From Swiss-Prot:
UniProt keyword list: Cleavage on pair of basic residues, Golgi apparatus, Neuropeptide, Secreted, Signal
Sufficient for inhibition of PCSK1 (motif): residue ranges: 237-242
Chain segments carrying region ProSAAS(1-180): 34-213
Taxon lineage: Eukaryota, Metazoa, Chordata, Craniata, Vertebrata
Organism: Mus musculus
The protein's name in its UniProt record: ProSAAS
Main location: secreted
Subcellular location(s) of the protein: Secreted; Golgi apparatus, trans-Golgi network
PANTHER family reported in the protein's UniProt record: PROSAAS
Molecular functions (GO terms): serine-type endopeptidase inhibitor activity
Length: 258
């Protein structure tokens, strides 16, 4: 009790008052500790009043003793409660101090581990060797060495889903050599070949620089004029049919958006 904060700290006044009250209640009242004064008896005085006064005096002695015992028990319980609260507070402060000491030691070890060695190459001016250790030390101090919080801090972020690649657009070869080029390159859209073949067979002299529109899908019979002989139409259809089945060695490239 000599080094107890209850006697030295801000609670010293309350504990001192409780101790004084306890000592005051344990001390007997002066009416009970004083000796009764014997009164001179006369021969004519009867002894009956002595018997009557002896009973209230005995009751007066029993009542203060019971009240003092109850007050002493209450004070003892209050003092035990204060001592238990002081013990819990001291244990909590010691545990907090131990955690802080462990966090400081771990931060120093991480800082020493992250410091550059003599065998390491020189760092750039923008590199900070103390940054990883400082960040991890701050995370440990915030988590208070909690394994769950530390695991949540160290779990890597999930990788982002791969973005789809945009479709490849190619104008393809133009001019009178489209048929020969189509036989050698199987990665050509059949719809575009059908459109270009129809334009060539009709003898149109318009420039073919721009690709065919997406929604312009006409059959070969509509593009062909009435002056084209039937055998040429049959040959064109057979060539388009052969182009629609490319070889499986090279994957077909998409020229138009789906």
């Amino acid at each position: 009790m000599a080094g107890s904060p209850l006697l030295c700290g801000p609670r010293a006044g309350g504990v001192g008052i409780l101790v004084l009250l306890l000592l005051g209640l344990l001390r007997l009242p002066p009416t009970l500790s004083a000796r009764p004064v014997k009164e001179p008896r006369s021969l004519s005085a009867a002894s009956a009043p002595l018997v009557e006064t002896s009973t209230p005096l005995r009751l007066r002695r029993a009542v203060p003793r019971g009240e003092a015992a109850g007050a002493v028990q209450e004070l003892a319980r209050a003092l035990a409660h204060l001592l238990e609260a002081e013990r819990q507070e001291r244990a909590r402060a010691e545990a907090q101090e131990a955690e802080d000491q462990q966090a400081r030691v771990l931060a120093q070890l991480l800082r020493a581990w992250g410091s550059p060695r003599a065998s390491d190459p020189p760092l750039a001016p923008d590199d900070d060797p103390d940054a990883p250790a400082a960040q991890l030390a701050r995370a440990l101090l915030r988590a208070r060495l909690d394994p769950a919080a530390l695991a949540a801090q160290l779990v890597p972020a999930p990788a982002a889903a791969p973005r789809p690649r945009p479709p490849v657009y190619d104008d393809g070869p133009t001019g009178p050599d489209v048929e020969d080029a189509g036989d050698e390159t199987p990665d050509v859209d059949p719809e575009l070949l059908r459109y270009l073949l129809g334009r060539i067979l009709t003898g149109s002299s318009e420039p073919e620089a721009a690709p065919a529109p997406r929604r312009l899908r006409r059959s070969v019979d509509q593009d062909l004029g009435p002056e084209v002989p039937p055998e040429n139409v049959l040959g064109a259809l057979l060539r388009v049919k052969r182009l629609e089945n490319p070889s499986p060695q090279a994957p077909a490239r998409r020229l138009l958006p789906p």
